[in-house]
């Protein structure tokens, strides 16, 4: 347990950020899963619309530091490639 005021404050800040980050990570995973589900169901329009909804959420998580920026970009890139491959079929 923290004994200094600054350590107690830092502990509170860390806990608040952890809770926020868990929420954002869960949201990102949900959006990714919706895109992948649409791809598996061979739903081209559904996959494209799900991707368009997922991209800003993933990008924002990268910008906020929840994910590393390159990790967010990699998620977006891979999802986009999968959707484009399905549309091309």
Swiss-Prot record:
Functional summary from the UniProt entry: Binds directly to 16S ribosomal RNA.
Protein name stated in the entry: Small ribosomal subunit protein bS20
Entry GO CC: cytosol; small ribosomal subunit
PANTHER family to which the protein is assigned, alphabetical: 30S RIBOSOMAL PROTEIN S20, SMALL RIBOSOMAL SUBUNIT PROTEIN BS20C
Family: Belongs to the bacterial ribosomal protein bS20 family.
Keyword Phosphoprotein: no
Gene3D superfamilies: Ribosomal protein S20
Gene Ontology MF: a single term: small ribosomal subunit rRNA binding
Superkingdom of origin organism: Bacteria
Species this chain originates from: Syntrophus aciditrophicus (strain SB)
Biological process per Gene Ontology, one example term: translation
Keywords annotated in UniProt: Ribonucleoprotein, Ribosomal protein, RNA-binding, rRNA-binding
């Amino acid at each position: 347990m923290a004994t200094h005021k600054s350590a107690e404050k830092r502990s509170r800040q860390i806990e608040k950020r952890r809770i926020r980050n868990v929420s954002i990570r869960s949201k990102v995973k949900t959006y990714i899963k919706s895109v992948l589900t649409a791809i598996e169901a061979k739903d081209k329009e559904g996959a494209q619309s799900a991707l368009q909804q997922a991209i800003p959420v993933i990008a924002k998580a990268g910008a906020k530091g929840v994910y590393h920026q390159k990790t967010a970009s990699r998620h977006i890139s891979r999802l986009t490639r999968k959707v484009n491959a399905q549309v091309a079929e």
